[in-house]
Amino acid sequence: RDATRAFSLPCIEEPDVEADDIIASYAREAQRQGWHVTIVSSDKDLMQLVGERDGARIDMLDTMKNARIYINEVEEKFGVGPDKVGDVLALMGDSVDNIPGIFGVGPKTASKLIAEHGGLTAALDAAEGMKKSKLKERLIEHRADAELSRVLVTLREDCSLPVTLEDMKLDEVPPEPLAAFLGKHGFTSLLKRLEAGNGSPSRATDLNPAKPETAGAPASSAGNRQPLPEFPAVDRSAYECVQTLDRLEEWIARAMAARLVAVDTETSSLDCMLCDLVGVSLALGPNDACYVPLGHGGSDMFAERPEQVDKAAALAALAPLLASDAVVKVFHNGKYDLNVLARNGFAVAPVEDTMIMSFDLDAGRQLDGIGGGHGMDELASRHLGHTCLTFKEICGTGKKAIPFGEVPLDKATEYAAEDADVTWRLYKTLKPRLATEGGTRIYERVDRPLVPVVAQMERHGIKVDRTRLAKLSEEFAGEIARLEKEIHAIAGTEFTVRSPKQLGEVLFDTLGYKGGKKGKSGQYSTDQSVLERLSGEGAEIAGKVLEWRQLAKLKNTYTDALQQAINPETGRVHTSYSLVGAQTGRLSSTEPNLQNIPIRTEIGRQIREAFVADDGNVLLAADYSQIELRLAAHMADVPTLKEAFAQGEDIHSRTAIEMFGEVNRDTRGRAKTINFAILYGISRWGLAGRLGVEADEAQAMIDTYFQRFPGIQKYIVRTLEQVRERGYSETLFARKTWFPRIASKNQAERQGSERAAINAPIQGTSADIIKRAMVRMMPALEAAGLGHVRMLLQVHDELVFELPEGDVDAASAVIERVMAGAAEPAVKLDIPLGVDIGTGTSWGAAH
């Protein structure tokens, strides 16, 4: 993003759309208009596009090899033409893109099979006639994997194009943002060429290079800033490798006296629930840093291990420092380090986190025209003018990569101690900004105390029933097969259900359903909205295809994948939460993502049934009731909605009465859609698509909504005015989210920013409230004698706990009280927060 925007190139992002699909759609559209297209990539999937149509060519450029890729190069690589590349990929799979393929089938075998049989289906069909072999068994047994893989590698060529090709024409590159980008990343020769051609931008405001002997930091953006501290340039030769217990104890004594130490850990892997601790680094000031190796060497039984402190002795020496309330421990992404240290028996407090500081100051903000991520390397470059050593530089890549524990100690010290040194410098840079830029409240009262809470939740994990998951996978596979047969029976012909092209032809050509629209690729659109419309009009086949697609996705994403995610040591699934993953402040969940399991469907319930409590325990799910609508009523000051909530009315039924004059299943459903859609700044076209009506009718509904609830429209107008004026939105708890594209000349970017800005104060306030509840929860439970209750998950507006069955009543009372009162005393809401609580031996049963 940073580079493209610096060069004034369009940066196109579409929610829920793969980048490859956007590239494919633009490439095909340009080709249709007669342009020669070069895709700058070496991605195997995109090689399916290479070739010529109607005199217009698509080729590729591999910049790593400085090589063009034409049809001949594709055939040389895959043994087949571009049109069969997807078939080859479906057999061989791709671990990088999570394409399963068929285990044991490599590129050569896959190419040979496709070349010999002419396509994937034919190759799989031919397996039955093969001589007995492992290959035959694999092709038959894993046919479904190959067929699913073929869907996954198929490029969509009919995506909407938010920026027209005409608007992509580049006339002139404004020099200021480009100069800032080049200066930030050290492209000095390019910067000189730019200045020679366009004149020099204001160096004082745009580049602000560091003095030769110091490493200052350009970090200008909207708003006033305190002068940033200047530090000596990073000198890796000054770092110490601590190899004796005496020297370690001297460092610990100095840290105790300093009352503040930056800490970083080095591990054997990125999985903090399974990794070994390889070393610890400490920093007490700029260039005053050390690395304590604890687990280097040992993989080669014939090689002598390097001298290092005995691990048990080192851990015993470090424990008082890490536990001391008198010494602040500063981390970057401290949640990871806290889990690593907890795995080795450490209790760590108090904790500061520079990644969280950066997020609370600059979420969404672009600095010097450049994007604002929160990783250490990016922050070091942005704020310190320093380029950190990378893990790849130290450990290598590919087949030559070595584990960190095998890195020579001199190199390991440079890398590890630098991390602690940079963390210390970032702390001294960012901490003062919290006070001067209004970030202290959200950092100190919400996000900083949340770090150890979330770390503990990750360590708890949640038990899953592997047998139940395997059974669900088997049931889903059977249902998928059954649905496929029923779909074929309705169609009167066999076809590949997962193929949008074949499905479109069956629906609109063979069966003759009306309303089929071909995209620019010449294929009928068969996306979810099309199928939902057809199903609503009585097309049985469309409903079955929707069900087939959902089952296939859930099987691949959850019932199969969750079995692989079970920790072999604990038998539980340990998801990883990101505290900086969503600009509004919401937590995001990965590895596995537990937040995308369908909420209100029978299938989603079945998957949740596989998340279970230990014997004698139950799971308790506590969910805020319609919290965003309650917050909207408060923040927009809507008397009608306030009254409805105060009286305990069904809010969607009340909206239906206000909008349509009556309540029935249809009007309530429409009212519910409208309630949430308008809070997200939906357009009339977007609402029309969701409700299946014409745009004019949708606009009339929006107008009626604003007439019945005028406070909502005033809130939207007021919020957008404030964001345009200040550059950021703000929650009730003073969390800022920046919107640098709110005044973009690009309509798609501007409208996307406006929609996000409308919702950010509401969604962000909701996130702040549940975070405040999480921070307060365990102290409240401990005070009630319920410290053994474990908080396991946070999913959207829900918290999930595990506890003995006999403690349900007492724990429910505490949990409801904490969650309902989480906004206070900082914010007094006009509408009480409702909390729904359920329990059961499984997560599904708790709903």
Q: For each predicted feature, which ranges?
A:
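Short alpha-helix plus adjacent loop in nuclease-associated cores
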Residues: 46-80, 136-138, 290-312, 316-320, ...
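C-terminal structured "cap/appendage" subdomains that terminate the fold
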Residues: 141, 167-171, 777-836
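Conserved "right-hand" nucleotidyltransferase catalytic core of DNA-directed polymerases
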Residues: 142-304, 349, 367-371, 379, ...
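Short beta-strand
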Residues: 14, 39, 496-498, 790-795
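Acidic beta-strand-to-loop metal/phosphate-binding motif
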Residues: 13-15, 38-42, 262, 326-334, ...
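Extended two-metal-dependent nuclease catalytic cores across DNA- and RNA-processing enzymes
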Residues: 1-162, 377, 381
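Conserved catalytic core of nucleic-acid polymerases
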Residues: 402-405, 456-459, 567-582, 587, ...
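Short active-site loop/helix that positions an aromatic residue
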Residues: 47-52, 270-271, 280, 335-346, ...
